[in-house]
């Protein structure tokens, strides 16, 4: 059974209202979790809108989306455990709507590092 909900505005009884554009634009559209520590990454352990992941070397992966963003102005956030930092880069030298490069590094020297339990979230408008 298929259904449709049509709403232009969400209204709260005491907090006012909000147009649904904010909800649609602001939700996570691509997310994932992977472990790179001591292994070649070939898949995500959990994901949304992910078509593939490529292990480019130490602390360097590229994630590809099933459905692309409508532009390259999407937002990114990520984290990893064990004294690491997650950085987002341009896949192939320039930001693209269909892929994002993720770099994991140590917090002390910013050297490339293979960290476990790395997660990322990207939000923006889908094409």
List each model region and its residues:
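Extracellular jelly-roll beta-sandwich "head" domains, especially the C-terminal globular C1q domain
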Residues: 79-127
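Extracellular receptor-binding modules and their adjoining Ser/Thr/Gly/Asp/Asn-rich linkers
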Residues: 3-69, 108-127
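Short, surface-exposed, low-complexity cationic segments
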Residues: 68-81
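A generic short-segment signal for beta-strand/edge and adjacent turn/coil regions
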Residues: 2, 30-33, 87-94
């Amino acid at each position: 059974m298929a259904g449709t909900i049509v709403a232009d505005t969400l209204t709260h009884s005491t907090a006012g209202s909000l147009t649904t554009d904010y909800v649609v634009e602001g939700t996570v559209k691509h997310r994932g979790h992977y472990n790179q520590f001591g292994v070649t990454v070939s898949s995500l352990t959990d994901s949304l809108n992910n078509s593939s992941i490529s292990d480019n070397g130490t602390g360097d992966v590229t994630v590809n989306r099933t459905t692309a963003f409508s532009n390259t102005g999407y937002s990114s956030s990520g984290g990893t455990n064990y004294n690491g930092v997650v950085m987002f880069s341009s896949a192939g030298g320039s930001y693209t709507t269909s892929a994002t490069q993720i770099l994991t590094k140590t917090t002390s020297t910013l050297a490339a590092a293979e960290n476990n339990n790395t997660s990322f979230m990207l939000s923006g408008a889908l094409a």
